[in-house]
């Protein structure tokens, strides 16, 4: 799965890109400009989708009782997708790209997107910066998600079944609960718990006491199940099967983007992931433009691009049974 040297031409630097692919000074100023107002709209949109979806489900099942057999399962699955929206905007906040003012970025990014999505923003930021400094390195916090690929098809399905069943989600939830016992981690856990109280209260206002179960069934449970599946599929598509290198083309996959993938797995342009790893200071709104610059320079070639995510997942699950490594706990 690692691209050969014939697919990795040495064409940098150019007048617009540096040796590593980062934008040169003039282009950098253009690509790194802030998008404060647009991100206010993005945050409002995510909240509207979250609570609007559940409100619509409550209304439909009240008006048409027979629709519950379809409406609630569809809402459950779609709420798993909602956590991708929270996660990516929280990721922007971790890079301090959500708002140009750092205090506003951390305050709004924490309380409006990270904590509702069960993410401790400051702790996540520390780990995520280690990921960007040295993918696949000794301090890589996400290595257990995508190391040792390709694996067998059966192994991938076992991982996805654990995600879908809530087994993986329970590990994450247990870690959050255990954080209350730690003096250093407790402040993060309290903030997340406080945000969940607000979410639960909002859902109670939407559904009434007769639907007290909305938070555990349509917020917590999708986060523990559907979101785990989507997060794994996205994570392995970003870095699975690659290697530690200073050349980001060897650490990060390139996949042609589609509306389907952008809706379910890679919202807010996060699918242009190679561009993000080339320059993590570029806001998500500009990642397609940076990717276009990398292609125009000849640094990203058609040979390293997967036509869609399905083809990449097939490659990641293409190992023979005799080649499978004992990593079933991940």
Where are these regions (language model features)?
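C-terminal membrane-associated helical module and adjoining short loops/tails
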Residues: 180-242, 247-248, 252-272
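Transmembrane alpha-helical segments that form the membrane-embedded catalytic/substrate-channel core
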Residues: 78-90, 120-122, 160, 169-172, ...
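Non-catalytic, topology-defining segments of multipass membrane proteins
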Residues: 1-79, 114-217, 284-330
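Active-site-flanking alpha-helical
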Residues: 53, 94, 98-99, 112, ...
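Histidine-centered catalytic micro-motifs
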Residues: 86-95, 124-136, 234-241, 266-282
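Membrane-interface elements of multi-pass transporters and channels
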Residues: 59-64, 93-101, 131, 180, ...
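Aspartate-rich (DDxxD/NDxxD/DxxxD) Mg2+/diphosphate-binding motifs
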Residues: 89-108, 141-145
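Transmembrane alpha-helical core residues of multi-pass small-molecule transporters
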Residues: 75, 109, 113, 222-223
């Amino acid at each position: 799965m690692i691209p050969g040297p014939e697919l990795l031409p040495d064409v940098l630097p150019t007048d617009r890109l540096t040796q590593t692919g980062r934008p040169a000074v003039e282009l950098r100023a253009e690509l790194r400009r802030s998008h404060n107002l647009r991100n206010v709209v993005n945050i409002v949109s995510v909240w509207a989708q979250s609570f609007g979806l559940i409100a619509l489900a409550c209304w439909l099942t009240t008006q048409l009782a027979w629709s519950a057999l379809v409406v609630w399962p569809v809402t459950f699955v779609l709420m798993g997708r909602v956590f991708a929206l929270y996660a990516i905007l929280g990721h922007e906040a971790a890079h301090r790209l959500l708002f140009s003012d750092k205090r506003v970025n951390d305050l709004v990014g924490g309380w409006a997107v990270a904590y509702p999505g069960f993410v401790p923003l400051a702790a996540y930021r520390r780990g995520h910066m280690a990921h960007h400094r040295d993918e696949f390195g000794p301090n890589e916090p996400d290595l257990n998600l995508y190391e040792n690929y390709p694996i067998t098809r059966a192994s991938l399905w076992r991982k996805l079944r654990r995600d879908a069943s809530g087994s993986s989600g329970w590990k994450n939830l247990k870690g959050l609960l255990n954080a209350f016992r730690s003096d250093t981690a407790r402040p993060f856990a309290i903030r997340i718990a406080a945000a969940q109280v607000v979410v639960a209260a909002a859902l109670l206002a939407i559904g009434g006491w007769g639907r007290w179960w909305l938070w555990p069934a349509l917020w917590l449970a999708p986060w523990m199940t559907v979101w785990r599946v989507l997060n794994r599929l996205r994570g392995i598509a970003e870095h699975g099967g690659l290697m530690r290198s200073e050349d980001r083309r060897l650490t990060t996959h390139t996949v042609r983007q589609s509306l389907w993938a952008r809706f379910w797995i890679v919202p807010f342009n996060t699918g242009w992931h190679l561009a993000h790893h080339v320059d993590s200071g570029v806001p998500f709104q500009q990642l397609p433009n940076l990717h276009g610059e990398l292609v125009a320079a000849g640094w990203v070639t058609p040979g390293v691009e997967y036509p869609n995510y399905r083809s990449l997942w097939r490659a990641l699950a293409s190992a023979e049974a005799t080649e499978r490594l004992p990593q079933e706990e991940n």
